[in-house]
Amino acid sequence: MKEYSSDKIRNVAVVSHDGTGKTALVESLLLTSGAVDFVGKGQDNKHIMDFEPEEIKRNVTIQLGMAPCEWHDHKVNFIDTPGYNEFHGEVRAALRACDGMLMVLSSTSGVETDTVRAWDYAVELQMPRMAFINKMDVDGADFFGTIERMRELFGKGIMPLQIPIGEGADFEGVVDVAKMTAFTYKDGQPTEVAVPAHLIEKAQEIREMTVEAAAEGSDELLEKYLEGEELSLEEIRQGLREGMISGRVCPIMCGSATSRIGLDQVLDRMIRYMPDATKKVMTATDAETGEQCVVHVDKPLTAFVFKTLLDPFAGKQSFVRIFSGELKEGDRLFDVNQGVEEKWGKMVTLIGKQQIPVSAAKAGDIVVIPKLANAKTGDTLTAPDFKVTYDAIRFPQPLYTVAMEPVKKGEEEKLASAVLKVAEEDPTCVVVKNAEARQLQIDCMGEVHLEHILNKMDRKYGVQAKLVTPYIPYRETIKGSAETESKYKKQSGGHGQYGHVKIQVDPLYDGSEFAFVDKIFGGAVPKQYIPAVEKGAKETLDKGLIAGYPMIGVQVTLLDGSYHSVDSSELAFKVATSQAIKDVIPKAKPVLLEPIYEVNVFAPDAFMGDIMGDLNSRRGRVLGMEQSERTGISVVKAQVPLAEMSDYVTALRSITQGQGVFNRQFYTYEEVPHKQAEEIIAAHKTQE
């Protein structure tokens, strides 16, 4: 594959809801372009793009895949993405690397949840969008119904460039409304024909919409249109391109990936309407000054690692988008985030898992660099004399928390290492570092994602894990005040031990976890032993007095005490204080606290009642409901105990038929109800 200049490169993220035929479309586009000489069939589990064992087993895309093709002296880099929502992090990574998005919709299913989710993220990134309505040859295909629904959700910028000739078993081609000509297909090859008579009126109606949208692309075209002059085909295309790049217009095409109908026109329109890399202007941060700067394609080399793959045998592969300059074999490469110069030997491009050597790549291209020792997903790679960083990818928040331990005893370190390697590949698998829990916890996207993680650790790193109950960081506190005194005295011949303290405990109401007050007068307890008293109190409270959880919100006041000139020591006062704390806390109305989270649930209005009922069943407090920015979507705001959220990802998906999402953040600690507290305390006692 030859080297292409920046203006001849198109980077396209292909996204959809699961089951629309997205991967089949990518592979058929590769076949149409001549990049491959065969395509797999999903039912045979032989996709070029889905080659990981888990993908073959499930017949779904799990991780993003790369595939370039050449078409009319241009290079198109396709990034195929997973459709299942638990792997949406891969979609976000792909969109950061690309300049345009191709949405794939099924003509029978229409607009589905994850299509909307991808659209919203592309809008957030101000990314041009194009759509392909697939499966027009399937029974129940409804092109115009899908267009109508898209307009309801995404606005009047949804602009069909084609209409189908027939639907279902009668589907045989497409009408190009701008040219007012038609194409029928046999074995993927087009034949230009006249527009069928029964479609002329509809095609002219849509053409008028298209011309009007194109005219709004510039003042010059709009003036010409309003004066009643006819726009030329080139002017229509120019206006549509400007409209798409601005995000005002989303061109719509249709066809069939499996029958290869309309695919040549998809490639034509990608080149015609998708922005090239010269249009990409990036904002970066100067690594030395911290100031924002603008990076054009003609600046020195900058590149961004948007995906990392690890293989126990082949090593690391870093997927890299070049935003400026040029990368050639032998060039120096600096990882600004890690602060090191990377040693590297070669770069390749991929079609599925097939590697194709690349000697040089210009701004706008996407390559894979093997065996970068330090680079991680989200890192910026630059020329050594032009150190800037790009913002990291904003991945979805993983909210499904699990704890695990190895099936085989003694493999704890092996399991921890495997989890960290999986997390390096997949930023939506987050290892929770919590020394208090004394267990390995991860946050992931859901049950399917978790199963994929467990299978990958077994297959790649030879370690099996079993799930255990995740640790909930309960806390203990007191609601009352109490006093006590304790004397630690030990004499066994020779030097003994003596420490005597009188203390008071009180609840703190300012949010502090611990406070120590010294009220000793007249040297009843010498000053050199006061720190030991404080340490003894703090360490004992940290171990917990009710159920083994740290006790917070407690003020300990040293009121009085006594000492022995020979036998007293720091240890003696520390032990005496510990005994006093254990004695006084039960008198101070101790209670158990649990973490409460603020939760925002986004879902269609029709599910609001069921969502609020479910939150109430989880001991949640529903604070209110309001409309979101998207029509028909509401937001429920609630406060919910963390202990009741372990299965909420799965439950919400079930309640809303996959259309609900939520986020959460820690809010406060509150007292655990009596019944639940008794259960927690009883469980602790059985483990002692």
Q: What does each of the following model-derived ranges do?
A:
Residues 1-688:
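Structural and coupling elements of P-loop NTPases
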